[in-house]
Each structure stands twice: as C-alpha cells, then as structure tokens.
Amino acid sequence: MSEVARLRHPDTIRRQSERMLALATQGRLEMWDINLGRLPDLGRMVGELTRVRYPDLAVPMHGRRLHFRVGDVDLWENRPRPADRDEAARSDVGLIVVSVLLDAGSGPRWRYTDTEIQGELSRSEGLAVASFRAWERGVFSSRGLPRVDSEALSGVGAASLAQAFQVREDNPLVGTEDRAALLRSLGRVSSRWPSQRVGGLFDLLSGHASSTGRLSAVTLLRTLLEQLSPLWPDSTMRDGQHLGDVWPYPPLGLMPFHKLTQWLAYSLIEPLHAAGITVTEVDRLTPLAEYRNGGLLIDGGVLTPVTPGWRTTSHPLSSSLVVEWRALTVALVVRLAELVREDLGARLSMAQILEGGTWAAGRRLAAAARPDARPPVNVASNGTIF
C-alpha cells in the first residue's frame, strides 16, 4: 500500500489516534491533560440523551439528511425527486455533496431564516437549510433545476453564495470566500465525472460496487478522497497528491482525520441504499474529529488544555493543540461508544452512537457552558475543513 493510500485508510486514522491516546495516558502530551475516570459518567449521560431522543433505540445513522429536518418540517422527505431510481440517486448525491462541503463551522454569529421554518437557524441546521434552499432554487445548476452541475459551480462567487446564505455585515458567515472557492474547485473536479454533474459521483461509486450491490465503506471513503483531494490545494502533499485533512505532528508523523469526507461518507450511505447499493463495514469508518465530539470531552471533564490563555487564543488547525485534541477525540469516542452500548444494552453502530449520541451531547454541554453554544476551543477555520 502506498503512503497516500495508507493515509486515506480509516484504519490509519484509528491507529494514529490510538498512538496519541497512549502518549496522553503516559503524560507525554504538550497541550492536554486527560482524566479517563470521567468517561463512565459521560457514557451514562450520552446513553440517557440517546434514550430521550430515541426511546425505542431505533437510532438513525448520523448523516446530513437529518439536518434537513427541523421541527415538523422535513425538507428531505419533500424534496423534488426524479422518478427514475438512478437519476434520483444522482440528484440526492449532488445535494448531499454540496451541502456537506458547505457544512464546516459557520461561526457563532451567523443566522438563517426560512419562510417555512419558525425561528432563526444557526450552525449545522442553518447551513443545511440554506444549502437545500439554494439547491432547490437552482443556484448550483446551469439549467435552473434542483441539481448540481460543473458549469454552475465553476461560476459561484462569494457574492452569490452570500446572497443565498443571507450573509451581511451584521450576519457574517466564516469563510464565505473560501467556501465559494471550494465550490468552484468542485465544479472543476466534477467536470471529469459522468454527465459533468456532482451526481455523477453516484456512477463512479456504483462502479465500485460488487455484482450483488455491496460497497465497502473503506472503498467508499477511498473513492471520495481520490476524487475530492484537489479541493484542498493548500494541504500536505505526497507523490504529487493533496492529502486534505492530514496534519504533520513530529512525535507521530502525519495525522489523518478526513473529518469532512468521512461525514460525507456517512451521509451518502442512505441515498446509496435507496439506489440498491448496500454499504458494508460501516464501522470501519471512525468517529468524526470535529468540535462537537471533541467539545464533549472537554466540557465533560475528560480533556483539559494545559496552556494558559487557551480559551482566548485562536488556534490553527495545524497547531499541536488542535491536532492532539482531534486525535484524542477519535480514540476516546471509540471508548465512549462501548460505554454507551453497555448503558443502553444495545449494539448500536458508531454511526448511531454519533447521532444518538455524542454530537447532540456535545452541543448540549456547550450550550450549558457558553451562551452561544460555541465550541470550547477557538479554531481558526476558513470554512472548508473543520
């Protein structure tokens, strides 16, 4: 296996994160103290929240389409959809891909209002609804249809994205220009896909499925990373290829996370299933190294930064504090998931644990700790990775 292939494999994410946890338990990390004794209480809390949210424990898989449902309004269930199964899959894949890529942290001040949904929306739900409405209006289509094609994406500017997302001086969205640039890059990449549409990714993925319609989650992730790696031109390179969400960490080498691409992989499982493709080995994917899961561990008392002034400092994604935090998040959520399963007496998948779950618990603790529910660590993000 080449170095690039190894760094795109979820087993490498898990293995490197376990190595980071080993350093933490030995007291050898520069930026964090760890208290594993807090994990059981946190496991019970996540279990209790999961029971409240899903009393029958029929927990759906973590995925973007759940953010299209706000209160009694379910945009996903009522979306425009072609009658042909494969064409419907292309439509769904296009929507999911563009919405996930626009899902990096919005910042604490941004809000979105929708005519059908009461109240102001923010963060993931706000970004989801905003991207859905833009898709519905044909913002991402050269034909004015609710689809996503290369030609339209290649021309997306910051102004048009700002208009679609209701961005103003008093309603700033983190990284609006960078998000627009990301969509333009997606336009260039998807020009090589079938039909020059983002939905053509469905055809590429279905080509990797077996004759019985089975597709390994490892293959799903690898294919996504191979196709989407040009979207992150400023990332670390190996063998002439951009690695994306992979960061140097001298004590352990390169640390891969692929948070946004794994979030996309989780989010595509249901649309692929509806098209007759069963994604297998889903638990080979890892917990997502993002600020809700990671914030749960800080606000829950498992992790404590040791650097004075860490709360008031903006930390780059490449910083030791953030790289250590994200790796510990992956390894510790794996352990937390086992405690949640024991508490519930149910063998939920990792995707169900995240949904049930750790993401919601992280948001709840953040809201209790800080008025705007912002994450405990201020990460300097450009809105395209974290």
Residue ranges and their predicted role:
Residues 2-153:
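An N-terminal, globular interaction/scaffold subdomain
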Residues 82-89, 93, 209-216, 253, ...:
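Non-transmembrane, amphipathic alpha-helical segments
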Residues 98, 102-106, 225, 229-233, ...:
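Hydrophobic/aromatic-lined pockets within catalytic cores
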Residues 108-213:
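Conserved, well-structured core segments that form the ligand-binding/active-site neighborhood
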Residues 110-114, 236-242, 351-352:
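Short coil/turn segments at secondary-structure boundaries
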Residues 172-261:
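Loop-centered beta-sheet repeat module
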Residues 251-386:
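C-terminal structured domains
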